[in-house]
């Protein structure tokens, strides 16, 4: 593993890449990565709603669920810039989102649920449990609107498990934030950037999962 990661770092340095980042599968692996120069850097909130206790937010706007497809035209880059304009986050292009769309649609019955200028990537992980891996909604009202749309699209799940941005105000009362993902700066400029963000304690949102 060390040789592979060292080789990857050398290749990316030649490409002028600033960072490498990854998600460890367990605490033991996390400690191993720390020895190789990686450090915890990204944060999320993990929220679980039990189906029967999932309270449907009240809103009048209709749900517009969009199945994953190659022609998904939602302007995700602009939406993410708008939602996370005051938040550090990893920016994905339309191609990245479309790839995730096809992956979760083909293998997990996935769907992108939209509500106004907001969207969420949802899929079934097991036993009628819904996983929401990318909840892209900014303010309190937009989050309620998107939650309502998700509930309308998937009204009878046993559990609803969310991975959301740690800075999302709507979810702050539901759970504490936790680290999800590690980073390794590859040059002095990147090291300074990581240090400044750590000092601000505004840890970035990784968005699409890497595991």
Where would I find each of the regions flagged by the language model?
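Helix-turn-helix
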Residues: 29
């Amino acid at each position: 593993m060390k040789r592979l990661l060292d080789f990857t770092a050398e290749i990316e340095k030649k490409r002028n890449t600033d960072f490498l980042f990854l998600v460890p599968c367990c605490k033991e692996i996390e400690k191993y990565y720390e020895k190789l120069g990686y450090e915890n850097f990204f944060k999320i909130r993990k929220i679980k709603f039990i189906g029967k206790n999932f309270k449907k937010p009240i809103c009048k706007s209709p749900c517009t669920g969009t199945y994953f497809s190659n022609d998904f035209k939602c302007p995700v880059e602009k939406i993410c810039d708008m939602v996370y304009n005051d938040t550090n986050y990893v920016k994905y292009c339309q191609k990245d989102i479309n790839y995730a769309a096809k992956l979760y649609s083909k293998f997990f019955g996935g769907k992108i649920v939209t509500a106004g200028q907001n969207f969420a990537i949802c899929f079934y992980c097991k036993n009628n449990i819904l996983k929401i891996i990318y909840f892209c909604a900014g303010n309190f009202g937009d989050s309620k609107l998107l939650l309502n749309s998700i509930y309308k699209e998937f009204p009878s799940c046993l559990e609803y498990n969310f991975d959301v941005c740690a800075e999302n105000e709507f979810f702050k009362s539901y759970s504490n934030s936790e680290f999800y993902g590690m980073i390794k700066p590859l040059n002095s400029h990147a090291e300074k950037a990581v240090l400044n963000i750590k000092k601000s304690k505004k840890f970035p949102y990784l968005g699409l999962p890497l595991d």
